[in-house]
Amino acid sequence: NGVRNMFGYTGTYKGKEVSVMGSGMGMPSIGIYSYELYSQYGVEQIIRIGSAGAYAPQCNLFDLVIAQGACTNSNWASQYNIPGGTYSAIADFELASKAYQVAKEKGYPVHVGNILSSDIFYNDQPEVWKKWAQLGCLAVEMESYALYCNAAYLGKKALCILTVSDSFITHQETTAEERQNSFTHMMEVALELI
């Protein structure tokens, strides 16, 4: 807890040790924390949980979204100097498959697919999300792409499990209280992956 004032806590779940901590907001924050956890603290897998805005009509408030892949409008992967290319950031297949199975067994509405990790929260082009939706992105958040890139680069595992907090299609949204008190299904699924 003495590094960067981003507090982490370690306990046990069903007899297995598990650590939890915040990841900040956006790719720069999770990029720093995940890189250091993987490279300096021996962490082998990171499961990020968080909220997302739905781009797909089948994704309703409180549904889970397992980010099988993460697209981005960021230049995060430019650091890898891939000549003429972009990097497709994906989740660890084993973690994603197990998360899907756990969610189904628990009866939680769950969707699996691509999401958008965006650098932009308040977009000056309010309709741009439709282009990402047309390409099959289920939802938008701000961290998964950087986490998946760091995991791939360092030979580690990563997964993002999201809860739909609002919809770009219906304009429905959860309240701050609902986000604080009701987003527990993704936590339950994540804990079963330990």
Feature-to-residue mapping (PLM):
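A C-terminal functional module that forms or caps the active site or interfaces directly
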Residues: 126-159, 163
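His/Asp/Glu-rich mid-to-C-terminal helical/loop segments that flank catalytic regions of hydrolases
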Residues: 168-194
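Glycine-rich phosphate/pyrophosphate-binding loops
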Residues: 49-53, 154-169
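Active-site rim beta-loop-alpha module in soluble metabolic enzymes
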Residues: 85-134
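Metabolite-binding pocket within alpha/beta catalytic cores that recognizes anionic/polar moieties
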Residues: 1-97
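Glycine-rich beta-alpha junction loops
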Residues: 53, 116-121, 146, 164-167
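Generic non-transmembrane alpha-helical segments
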Residues: 98-106, 150, 189-193
